[in-house]
Amino acid sequence: MHIRPARAEDAAAIAPVILPVLEAMELPFLARHGLETTRTLLASAIAHPAYRYGYARGIVQILDGRIAGAAFGYPAEDEAQVDAPFAVVLQQHRLDPTQLLFTDLEAFPDEWYLDTLAVAPEQRGRGVGQALLRALPEVALARDKTRIGLNVDEANPGAHRLYTRLGYKTVGTRELSGHRYHHMQKTLNGRGH
């Protein structure tokens, strides 16, 4: 297993890993445009470094020479701009640039926000997600953030237990695309713990 920063050339391999997470969120965009169109648009947008899932905002786990999982996030103060590159991709594909994947605010102030943690379906149960989670403190600290935040669906108690076990605490709630989420945070001590 090897974790490294995502690269622009990873875009086509990352998109199908992230897509099931977006599908589970029941985003209106997917219902409107379908999985294949969304995958194509997502792959194009990942090549933009400033995008929510832009390669410069992500790390990937390589297993057996392939991307087994990915984690994407950003400092909370970047949230207002993270979807602008997707609007450009929509225009390039002659689609309405106001029809973004996400419309809700997700981050809490002054945190490095883990937007998405995704593991390829065939790689689940191999510790990929936990390895990516353990790598995040270094990512957050490199961006001068001493707190990591994330949202976990209230309907997913297993994930909530995992994050709790890894030191995250529930600090609030969010409603995203009609689903209720626990907002959890982990405070770092400067050494990544």
Predicted regions and their residues:
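A short beta-loop-alpha structural element at the N-terminal edge
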Residues: 2-16, 24-28
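Conserved GNAT-fold acetyl-CoA-binding loop/helix
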Residues: 23-46, 57, 91-94
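A short helix-loop-beta-strand connector motif used in the catalytic cores of GNAT acetyltransferases and
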Residues: 47-60, 77-81, 113
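Conserved beta-strand in the GNAT
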Residues: 60, 66-75, 113, 118
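Conserved acyl-donor/pantetheine-binding loop and adjacent beta-alpha core of acyl/acetyltransferases
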Residues: 77-112
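Conserved acyl-CoA
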Residues: 105-110, 120, 131-147
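C-terminal "cap" of GNAT-fold acetyltransferases
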Residues: 110-111, 145-160, 165-167, 172-193
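Conserved acetyl-CoA-binding loop-helix of GNAT-fold acetyltransferases
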Residues: 125-138, 161-165
